[in-house]
Amino acid sequence: MVKKVAVLGAGSWGSILANMLVQNGNDVVAWTNMEEQAKELNEQHSNEHYVPGFKYDERLVATTDLEVALKDVDAVLFVVPTKVMRLVAQQMVEVLKKTGQKPIIVHASKGLELGTHKRLSEVLAEEIPSELRQAIVVLSGPSHAEEVAKQDLTLVTAASSDLASAEAVQKLFMNNYFRVYTNDDIVGVEMGAALKNVIAIGAGALHGLGYGDDAKAALITRGLAEISRLGVAFGANPLTFIGLSGVGDLIVTATSVHSRNWRAGNELGQGMKLDEVIDTMGMVIEGVPSTKAAYELAQQKNIEMPITEAIYDVLYNEKGVKEAIDELMHRDGRSELE
């Protein structure tokens, strides 16, 4: 039974999940590499930069000491940016080597590793001891930290090739407002989680340019087709993409003002440059590196992904958003099912 949990990463999603796990009756330590953030969580029970105005459960403990966070843990939850996932995993392994602990490894991050384009469970599997690899679990689905903080109803998926581990995570997180389903398609769940951020940037850009619901619905639908094509090429179950971690996560990310990726696209649509958007937001926009990864993976697999390619051109080749949309609309006609 899981009772002691280390949450690695105390941004908006990590800190809210940690808070919920405390309220579910678990002993939880949140790890951050920022002393001031740990102090704020411990003393003011707040995390103003990430979740303004929210008061955290006083039982939640934060630390910058990884050994303290990992002491006697039954489960480790990674909620760190993709660019540091491997580094944090390496640091965790060094601690676990000293203690001999064998916790369930869970991650709730969404993206692909920069450079290698590997899924995050693959990154973790390369770093952790072999006996822990089979039990890696991915927690993903349509979920905003702001809504979970308010205890709005949220449903997600726990995916793992090991059913017992997925069910342990399901039990750990379930409560009267947070429901968890299990899935054995870890590839599809992670691909859906990463690639929906790309389409969300496009949806935000449409809004920024003033396009209506028809255009946004079309982009989301055709975007889902692209996500599914690429995911299936890497071994995903196509049915996963019509589930919570596929279309569910895509809808919420591509339509909500809570979504950083949607907000970034909205600013781009209004004429702001990418560097300005990143500086203004001050938080990770996972869809930006995920767009590059998706574009390059599509080239590698010879998969047609015109929307992804258009967003790539806007982000990396300084193409105007309106020009990119016009080019998409003037592509040759074809069957919808191609």
From Swiss-Prot:
Chief localisation class: cytoplasm
GO cellular component, one term: cytosol
Catalytic machinery residues: K196
Pfam family, one: NAD_Gly3P_dh_C
Annotated positions binding NADPH: S12, W13, K110, A145, R260, V284, E286
Keyword terms, alphabetized: Cytoplasm, Lipid biosynthesis, Lipid metabolism, NAD, NADP, Nucleotide-binding, Oxidoreductase, Phospholipid biosynthesis, Phospholipid metabolism
Enzyme class: oxidoreductase
SUPFAM superfamilies xref list: 6-phosphogluconate dehydrogenase C-terminal domain-like, NAD(P)-binding Rossmann-fold domains
Function: Catalyzes the reduction of the glycolytic intermediate dihydroxyacetone phosphate (DHAP) to sn-glycerol 3-phosphate (G3P), the key precursor for phospholipid synthesis.
Subcellular compartments: Cytoplasm
Biological-process GO terms, alphabetical: carbohydrate metabolic process; glycerol-3-phosphate biosynthetic process; glycerol-3-phosphate catabolic process; glycerophospholipid metabolic process; phospholipid biosynthetic process
Family per record: Belongs to the NAD-dependent glycerol-3-phosphate dehydrogenase family.
Protein name: Glycerol-3-phosphate dehydrogenase [NAD(P)+]
Any one GO MF annotation of this record: NAD binding
Catalyzed reactions: sn-glycerol 3-phosphate + NAD(+) = dihydroxyacetone phosphate + NADH + H(+); sn-glycerol 3-phosphate + NADP(+) = dihydroxyacetone phosphate + NADPH + H(+)
UniProt pathway annotation: Membrane lipid metabolism; glycerophospholipid metabolism
Binding site for sn-glycerol 3-phosphate: K110, G141, S143, K196, D249, S259, R260, N261
